[in-house]
UniProtKB/Swiss-Prot annotation:
GO terms for biological process: cell division; cell wall organization; peptidoglycan biosynthetic process; regulation of cell shape. Belongs to the MurCDEF family. Pathway: Cell wall biogenesis; peptidoglycan biosynthesis. It comes from Caulobacter sp. (strain K31). Keywords: ATP-binding, Cell cycle, Cell division, Cell shape, Cell wall biogenesis/degradation, Cytoplasm, Ligase, Nucleotide-binding, Peptidoglycan synthesis. This is UDP-N-acetylmuramate--L-alanine ligase.
Length: 472
C-alpha cells in the first residue's frame, strides 16, 4: 500500500490523464500517485503501463468518454491528444485546468533540484545512466524517464533524495517549460520540423533550454557534435561542462574498446581550475560509441553532484540498460535477436555500428520506418545509414496516424538503399513473412536487430520462438 502524504495544501479531486498509458504520461502519473495525489486516466486500450498504474491505485478507463472526467480536478494531456477528444471537450466545458504533460512534469521538478536530459538522440539512455550513478552514490533520486529502466522495471521512481532526473522531450517544444538545475544536451539534429518549422528554430530551442537553468546550475554538453559545439559559443551567461572524445572537452573519454560484454574506456576530467581526475578502465555492459558518450555525460553530472569514483565505477558496471535500447529478446539456433527503438537515421547508424562491434557474424537489420513525413524528409539519410548491416529488410511504414504520401513507402526506401550502393536490401511482404526470411538469411553467430518506434517491438519478442519452431 502506498503511504500517502498531502501533496497540496487543500483538498483536491482526482487528476485525470488522457492517454495515461503512454510512456511519458504513465511515468508522471506514477510519481503523482506515489507522492499522494489521486490519479485516474483513460487510454484507447489496456497495456502493461495501465495495469501497473491500476495496481498502484489509479482508476483506469479504457476508451475516451466525457463521463470519465466527472469529478476530476484537472486534466493532463499531451500533444498527441486532439482538441476534439470528448474528454478534452468536457474539460473545457467544465472550465477545468487543462495541463500539458510538460507543465505537470515541471510542477514535480519545482519541488526538488533537477537534472533535465535533452538532445535529439540518447535522452532515455542518458537519463537512465544518470539515475544509475546517482543511485550508486546513495543520492536516491526521483526519476521520470521516456523508457522502461530495467533496474526499476518501470519508467519512474520516487526517491528520498533531493534530486529528480527527467527526460526532456523537445519534439513539441514543451521542454522549455522545464526549469532544471542541471541540463544535458547530447546532440542536436534536424528532427521534429513539423513543430519547429526550421532547423534554426530547433537550435534556438536548445539554447533557451540551457539558458533556463539558474546561475548556480550548469549544462553538460557534447562538443563532439558540431551543432552542440556551435551552441556553446552562443551561451555566455551559464556554466558549461563540455564532454566528448575531442581533446578540448573538459570531460574527455578515450581508449574506447568494444566487445561482446560491452564497452571499456577511460575518462579524464580537466577542469578549467583544479586538479586532473582520471577514471581508468571504466566498464559498462552496453556496446556502442554513442552509449559511451551517454555514459560520459552521466559521469560529468554525477561527479559535479558529489558522487565518488568508486560509486561511478560501480554504477556503470552494474547498469542494467533500458527496454528497447539494444535489448536482446532471445537467441534462436545461435542467432541473437535484438530490439531497438532507433527510428532516425543517426540512431540507426549508431545502433548498427554497435551491432557490428559485438557480432561475430553478419548483422541483419529489419527496419519499420516510423511516419511518412519523417521518411519523406530524411529519405536520403535513411538510404545511406545502413552501411554496417550486411542485409537490410524493410517493412511497411508505421503510419502513427499519418496519411500515406505518394512516393514515400517501403519499396521506395528499398530502391533508395540500392541506389546508394547497399548490396542486399529486401522488402518484407508482411510481418508473417519475417521468420522464414530471417531463417533463410541468418546462421549461427549472426545478429538480427529490429529497428523502429512502432509495433516492430512485438515482432522482436515473437521472433526467437518462431525461428526455433521453423528449425524443428
Amino acid at each position: 500500500m502506498i503511504q500517502r502524504r498531502r501533496p497540496v495544501p487543500f483538498e483536491l479531486g482526482p487528476v485525470h490523464f488522457i492517454g495515461i498509458g503512454g510512456i511519458g504520461m504513465s511515468g508522471i502519473a506514477e510519481i503523482m500517485l506515489r507522492i499522494g495525489y489521486t490519479v485516474q486516466g483513460s487510454d484507447a486500450k489496456a497495456s502493461a503501463n495501465t495495469e501497473r498504474l491500476e495496481k498502484l491505485g489509479a482508476r483506469i478507463f479504457i476508451g475516451h468518454d466525457a463521463a470519465h472526467v466527472e469529478g476530476a480536478s484537472a486534466i493532463v494531456y499531451s500533444t498527441a491528444v486532439k482538441a476534439d477528444n470528448p474528454e478534452m471537450v468536457a474539460g473545457r466545458d467544465k472550465r477545468l485546468p487543462l495541463v500539458r504533460r510538460a507543465e505537470m512534469l515541471a510542477e514535480l521538478m519545482r519541488l526538488q533540484f533537477s537534472v533535465a536530459v535533452g538532445g535529439t538522440h540518447g535522452k532515455t539512455t542518458t537519463t537512465s545512466m544518470v539515475a544509475a550513478l546517482l543511485d550508486a552514490g546513495a543520492l536516491d533520486p526521483t526519476v521520470v524517464n521516456g523508457g522502461i529502466i530495467n533496474a526499476y522495471g518501470t519508467n519512474a521512481k520516487v526517491g528520498e533524495g533531493d534530486w529528480i532526473v527527467v527526460e526532456a522531450d523537445e519534439s513539441d517544444g514543451s521542454f522549455l517549460k522545464l526549469k532544471s538545475t542541471v541540463a544535458i544536451v547530447t546532440n542536436i539534429d534536424a528532427e521534429h520540423l513539423d513543430h519547429w518549422g526550421t532547423f534554426d528554430a530547433v537550435k534556438k530551442g536548445f539554447q533557451d533550454f540551457i539558458e533556463n537553468i539558474p546561475f548556480y546550475g550548469f549544462a553538460a554538453v557534447c562538443t563532439d557534435h558540431p551543432e552542440v559545439q556551435a551552441l556553446t559559443a552562443r551561451i555566455e551567461n551559464r556554466r558549461l561542462v563540455t564532454y566528448g572524445t575531442n581533446p578540448q572537452a573538459e570531460v574527455r573519454v578515450s581508449n574506447i574498446q568494444m566487445g561482446p560484454e560491452g564497452a571499456q574506456f577511460d575518462i579524464l576530467v580537466s577542469p578549467l581550475s583544479g586538479d586532473l581526475v582520471l577514471y581508468e578502465g571504466l566498464k559498462m555492459p552496453m556496446a556502442g560509441h554513442h552509449n559511451v558518450l551517454n555514459a560520459t555525460a552521466a559521469v560529468a553530472v554525477a561527479r559535479e553532484l558529489g558522487v565518488d569514483a568508486d560509486a561511478i565505477r560501480a554504477g556503470l558496471a552494474g547498469f542494467g540498460g533500458v527496454k528497447r535500447r539494444f535489448t536482446t529478446t532471445g537467441v534462436a539456433n545461435g542467432v541473437r535477436i535484438v530490439d531497438d527503438y532507433g527510428h532516425h537515421p543517426v540512431e540507426i547508424a549508431a545502433v548498427l555500428k554497435a551491432a557490428r562491434a559485438v557480432s561475430t557474424g553478419k548483422v541483419i537489420a529489419v527496419v519499420q520506418p516510423h511516419r511518412f513525413t519523417r521518411l519523406r524528409d530524411l529519405m536520403t539519410e535513411f538510404s545511406s545509414c545502413f552501411n554496417d548491416a550486411d542485409t537490410v529488410i524493410v517493412a511497411d511504414v508505421y503510419t502513427a496516424g499519418e496519411a500515406p504520401i505518394e512516393g514515400v513507402d517501403r519499396d521506395h526506401l528499398v530502391e533508395g538503399l540500392k541506389k546508394f550502393g547497399h548490396r542486399r536490401a529486401l522488402a518484407l511482404e508482411s510481418p508473417a513473412a519475417l521468420p522464414a526470411l530471417i531463417a533463410a538469411e541468418a546462421q549461427s553467430g549472426d545478429l538480427v536487430v529490429l529497428l523502429g518506434a512502432g509495433d516492430i517491438t512485438n515482432w522482436s519478442y515473437a521472433l526467437p520462438g518462431q525461428l526455433e519452431a521453423l528449425a524443428k
